[in-house]
Amino acid sequence: AALAGCNSDSDNDDAVVEPPAAVTPDSINLSFLGRYSAGIFAESAAEIPAFDPVNKRIFIVNAQKGAVDVLDATDAANPTLIDTLTAADVAADAVVNSIAYKGGYLAVAIEASPKTDNGFVALYDATTLELLGSAQVGAQPDMLTFSPDGQYLLTANEGEPNNDYSVDPVGSISILSLTDDEIVEVRTATFSSFNARRDELIQAGVRIFGPNASVEQDLEPEYIAISEDSTTA
């Protein structure tokens, strides 16, 4: 950002000149720089990345392992594996679904075993890789993101049913309040208020088709976007 000022004899000293609106480019150009190979083909061994610009590290969800691979990208042309974070310290037989990085912290979304049980979010120090804390959220947290101001961490809890639909958890969004390096509060928003409008929603084109499923059971959130002022998601 740049600021400029000058003296003025005008009576309209309070006038504000709006900066030009940012223009989103129609395309971007990408140039190959380097590659890390997990050595596993077609098994989702490199699924979701997050970059730590301070330590020059790349965190990657390795869905084949159900863990997070940590790469040293100091030499960007030749990133190397230096560590792997598992969910074992949080829950037995749990697997990692997603990650997010912000301000020196790595957040990890963890799916419980079975996946229909409530999952977890874990917070790590991105430098030491120390587990700072964890909290229980809704079933099958499938994506998570920090708010722009860093005060909140939100997870989209997909809540998929098991194979025979004998257990069908509700979809939900969990909102974790953060203070420094601690998770201090967890609130979970469900879609239960829409259950009474099931027929209305179906007529409007909303797909609700699970066997005997309520609206909140059939809605399976996968992604979250947050406003720049961190007030709306």
Model-identified regions with their sequence ranges:
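Bacterial Sec-dependent N-terminal signal peptides
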Residues: 2-27
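Blade-loop segments of beta-propeller domains
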Residues: 75-113, 138
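Residue-level detector of Asp-centered blade-edge/turn motifs that repeat once per structural unit
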Residues: 51-55, 101-104, 146-150, 227-230
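Beta-propeller blade signature
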Residues: 119-129, 168-180
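Surface-exposed loop and turn segments in beta-propeller and other repeat-based domains
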Residues: 29-41, 83-92, 179-219
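Short, conserved, GDST-rich strand-edge loop motifs in beta-rich repeat architectures
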Residues: 109-117, 156-172
